[in-house]
Amino acid sequence: MTSLVSLENVSVSFGQRRVLSDVSLELSPGKILTLLGPNGAGKSTLVRVVLGLVAPDEGVIKHNGQLRIGYVPQKLYLDTTLPLTVNRFLRLRPGTQKTDILPALKRVQAGHLIDAPMQKLSGGETQRVLLARALLNRPQLLVLDEPTQGVDVNGQVALYDLIDQLRRELDCAVLMVSHDLHLVMAKTDEVLCLNHHICCSGAPEVVSMHPEFISMFGPRGAEQLGIYRHHHNHRHDLQGRIVLRRGNGHS
């Protein structure tokens, strides 16, 4: 399968500080890659590299032609005194046609919000509106920066279900950044754990049949949520230096 974006041994420094070191990844059509890591691990910098906003100091980044990207930011800051409906907010995007707005909202099950004030939306509703905005670009790559932040578990399940539906309909690649180091979208194809470098990678554990998991999240939640078990052979000290572990290194 031809990748839409590939990074090969990419490193980025800001001044004397190395933020990313020797990072490689591939984003392919129809595949979901989830990026995990603690605060300050370089996740946002890596996203900016993928988006073409930061050039690597070392390594190679390859894009597949004129790549169409849809981006959902981590947070949306709006002036609470500014009267702005969902309709008007989406029309602020350059090139957006009025006739495109309602179909995009309906695609994310948010058509009923078209005349709602942006400031009155819940966390989950805001994420759906931002996702609709990203879809206006007919993306080949969908980048979601911590889309479940501020969303409860039921909202996460619904959002993951929607993301899975969209990636199948659009056959787009999905890069999802998560603040949760263990609970991820079950249908993620690959998980990367980043702490300035790739600490480990793998697929989420299938837990949908575990009775304890089902009792906690319900059958639908168990289908959409997965556990990622890290397998580091090292840890990072307070200065960020790598310290090798003894034994099997599972965490």
Curated annotation (Swiss-Prot):
InterPro entries, per the entry: AAA+_ATPase, ABC_transporter-like_ATP-bd, Metal_Ion_Import_ABC, P-loop_NTPase
Signal sequence range: none
Induction: Transcriptionally repressed by zur (zinc uptake regulator), in response to high extracellular zinc concentrations.
Protein name per Swiss-Prot or TrEMBL: Zinc import ATP-binding protein ZnuC
Oligomer and partners: The complex is composed of two ATP-binding proteins (ZnuC), two transmembrane proteins (ZnuB) and a solute-binding protein (ZnuA).
Pfam family for this entry, one: ABC_tran
Function noted in UniProt: Part of the ABC transporter complex ZnuABC involved in zinc import. Responsible for energy coupling to the transport system. Seems to be important for the virulence.
Subcellular location: Cell inner membrane
Originating gene: znuC
Organism: Salmonella typhimurium (strain LT2 / SGSC1412 / ATCC 700720)
Example of a GO biological process term: response to zinc ion
UniProt binding sites for ATP: 37-44
Statement: the UniProt record of this protein carries the keyword Protein biosynthesis: no
Source taxon at top rank: Bacteria
NCBIfam families associated with the record: PRK09544.1 (NF007090)
Group of enzyme by EC: translocase
Location of the ABC transporter domain: 5-220
EC number, as in UniProt: 7.2.2.20
Keywords, ordered alphabetically: ATP-binding, Cell inner membrane, Cell membrane, Ion transport, Membrane, Nucleotide-binding, Translocase, Transport, Zinc, Zinc transport
